[in-house]
Amino acid sequence: MWNIAVAESLTTQHVAELKRLYLDGTKHSCYQNVPRFMSRHIDLSEKLQPLWRDDVPRLDLVREYFDFSHLASVVDVGANTGYFSLSLAFDHPNLEVTAIEGHAGHADFIAEVADLAGLGNIKVVNQYVDQQTDPRLLDSEVVLHFNVLHHQGVDNPDNIDSTDRFFPVAAQALSRAHQEGRRLVLQMGFNWGGDKKQPIVALDDDLGKLRYLERLVEAARFEIRDLALPVLNEGGDRYRYVIYPFEHIRRD
């Protein structure tokens, strides 16, 4: 559990500041779930639509795929308000976690929670990852790259003017994470900058998305080993990820 002394030290000012940072009204505020260890003590959770945006299944996925108790380091690219990085740092005190987030308010939120929870194993870097990023910033065994790549050229200084120029910029940005033996967990949106009027691949073209993703990953010098696909529960209100070898997907 969260350190009792930490919980007792939460003042009204602490709560107000956390709410201000989490609910700041910017493009990606209230975007992630709040880490469970914190939500027990502070009610910041917004009503997130679990069929559209839910971080719990993705965290369950990476926990199923990796044994973090035997890993030394992980980097969370585009960490937002830190659901993944804070949760992993809290659950695995020996794991060195780096949360990279370009929005200053979100980065401050992660740092504030980490400080209050006494998490000395997490480093917060207020920076966007793009094609100019120093690869040493991403030095780790595992890189989490969840749903941020499609913002290349929109939410960072690359400033490209069309989806036609997106591919080489995104591939170069993703390649900054490449290192022999490093594992990358990649999820990519297909609306450029989150704009439904500017699809990178048509919404209903699932095969096209898969082919695009394969080309992009190869251009970044990675190789897809497995693919995780969402499966709805019997009630149809939540989903989980099921992992398939990528070669089976390609063959079928």
Label each PLM-derived region with a short phrase.
Residues 111-137:
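S-adenosyl-L-methionine
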